[in-house]
Amino acid sequence: MSALSGTRLVFGAGGVVSGLSAAQTLDLAQGADELGYDLFSLSDHLHSERPTDDPFTTLSWLAGQTRRIELATNVLALPYRPPPVVAKIAETLDRLSGGRFVLGLGGGGYDAEFHAFGLTERTGGQKIVGQREAITILRGLWSGKPTTLAGQEFSVHGARIDPPAARPIPIWLGAYGPRALALTGELADGWLPSIGRVGLDGARRMRTAVLTAATRAGRDPASIVCATNVIVRLGQQAPPGSGVVSGSVTEVIDQLVDIVAVGFTALLLAVPTVGELETLARDVLPAVRAQAAARTASS
């Protein structure tokens, strides 16, 4: 069973780190694997202020050079690839990695990329419809059965892939707006925002919206993994309002415990070096687990 599907507090690496060489990315993934982190993820952008790699290609490469750590897109810009193509790639990656893949999906938040690369520009409503249709197509194709959907954004007509997915591949949505949060609660296996973008109070309100939508859809809210990206700068002082967790070991522990208290059970820690992952694993994360557990027990 995936370490990410329960209520145990887990930690990941990678995520919003960019500008790394292939060798640095490999070191980071292998270091996270060896240090006991549970997930390594990569973002998805055609263009960025710093160099980035295609996540599917890179995660496939990393799957062959890691042992146990799960691998995720964080998050895949859905409009860049047709859902049937995503379904086939995701099934292959999950199979070749031994069932270690998590598909993080987003509607595509950077409209400038759509315009620059000649992609179809979609309204917010069209992105939500597209995500709903894509999830239906993905899960239908992964079942191995012929799948038909005449959608507004995406359509398939008796399509199937072979082999089918060996398991239900988890789908996490990088959701922020009311409609996206409602869709997450209704259909997704996980919710993946960035805490630095929304803050503690915003994250608390959004999580409530996700869980309320899950209940309304007849789902168990506890079945939804609540994960978040966290940029960490240990030993540094980030500017106020930057959304970066920073400071001394004690200060970083306190800030991470506050994030867990919102209801997050997976913290994806964005640091650029294995040395920083090692310091966090040794000096910070055991204390975060202990203090978070104590806070839960006393509440």
Model-identified regions with their sequence ranges:
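Internal, glycine-rich beta/alpha segment that forms the wall or movable "lid"
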Residues: S2-T7, P82-L187, D201-I224, G235-A238, ...
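Hydrophobic faces of well-ordered beta-strands that scaffold small-molecule active sites
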Residues: L9-G15, F40-L42, E70-N74, F101-L105, ...
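Active-site mouth loops of central-metabolism enzymes
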Residues: F11-A23, L76-P84, A165-Y176, Q236-E251, ...
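Short, acidic/polar
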Residues: L20-A32, V86-I89, L173-E186, V244-I259
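Generic structural signal for well-ordered alpha-helices
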Residues: T25-Q30, F56-S60, A87-E91, R132-R139, ...
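Alpha-helix-loop-beta-strand connector modules within alpha/beta enzyme cores
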Residues: T52-N74, G130-I137, L141, T208-A217, ...
